[in-house]
């Protein structure tokens, strides 16, 4: 007995798909090494490989789940390589595309690997021409300002990177739909909409599959930068306080010690020991900050 219609089942699959990518992105950003890679835009080859495999290996499980269990919600054959290329360069995107396309190719989908690798190179190509910070501005709520960005393109004849970042996954999804309709599901897996509304929702879910991880990871980047700023601010405050207090404090203390050396040598010795202990403690505190 089928409790859901075809459209309802497809809509549920798309919602679960977005939940899966959100959970996976949150789990990955908890790893210190993965977070450290996100903080730098100029990455070495080793960091790109680590990023590609840390993102690609869990996504391979999603493709395998679709092939073995017929569970379509965990398939990110398009969004995964595109996201890797967008954040780590074309070769990282191609590596993720190869990882995700391999089980699909083994399962008989001959067009899966070329398409996935192409998505990786597409994301990497956009990264090469797009300002790096513009990538991090892509948000799951991009469509709320879409009309304003479209008007800027029309009125100023200037490239709007948000529109490009949102349009690229839509274009790739249309290519996948076209290839799937032409050659069938034996060539490549694709969601089959029964109306224009469902086709639009499929395209929207593809963009959100890219935008949600970027939003989650950008939040982690901002939190790390705020922590660094708080640490630097605390260091500056400690240094300013030490520079303000130490000269007067030392002058008064040394004056008192000099007057006690002849009359009360034991008291002067005690003051010197306390002063040295206090200065050592202040030095350790500054080194700690």
Regions found by a protein language model. Give the residues of each.
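Hydrophobic transmembrane alpha-helices
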Residues: 2-82, 92-93, 97-194
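Two-component histidine phosphotransfer core
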Residues: 193-289
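Alpha-helical transmembrane segments of polytopic membrane proteins
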Residues: 9-19, 108-119, 191-204
């Amino acid at each position: 007995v089928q409790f859901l219609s075809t459209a309802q089942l497809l809509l549920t699959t798309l919602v679960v798909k977005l939940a899966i990518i959100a959970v996976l992105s949150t789990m990955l950003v908890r790893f210190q090494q993965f977070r450290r890679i996100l903080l730098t835009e100029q990455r070495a080859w080793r960091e790109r490989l680590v990023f590609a495999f840390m993102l690609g290996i869990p996504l391979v499980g999603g493709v395998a789940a679709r092939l073995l269990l017929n569970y379509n919600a965990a398939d990110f054959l398009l969004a995964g390589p595109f996201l890797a290329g967008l954040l780590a360069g074309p070769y990282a995107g191609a590596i993720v595309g190869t990882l995700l396309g391999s089980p699909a190719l083994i399962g008989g989908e001959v067009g899966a690997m070329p398409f996935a690798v192409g998505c990786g190179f597409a994301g990497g190509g956009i990264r090469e021409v797009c300002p790096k910070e513009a990538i991090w501005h892509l948000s799951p709520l991009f469509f709320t300002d879409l009309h304003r960005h479209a008007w800027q393109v029309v009125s100023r004849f200037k490239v709007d990177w948000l529109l490009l970042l949102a349009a690229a996954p839509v274009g790739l999804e249309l290519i996948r739909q076209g290839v799937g309709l032409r050659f069938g599901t034996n060539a490549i897996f694709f969601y089959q909409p029964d109306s224009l509304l469902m086709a639009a929702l499929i395209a929207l879910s593809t963009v959100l599959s890219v935008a949600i991880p970027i939003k989650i990871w950008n939040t982690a980047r901002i939190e790390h930068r705020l922590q660094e700023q708080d640490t630097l601010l605390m260091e500056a405050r400690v240094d300013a306080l030490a520079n303000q207090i130490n000269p007067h404090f030392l002058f008064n203390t040394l004056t008192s010690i000099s007057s006690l050396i002849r009359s009360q040598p034991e008291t002067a010795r005690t003051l010197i020991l306390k002063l040295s202990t206090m200065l050592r403690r202040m030095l350790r505190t500054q080194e700690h900050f």
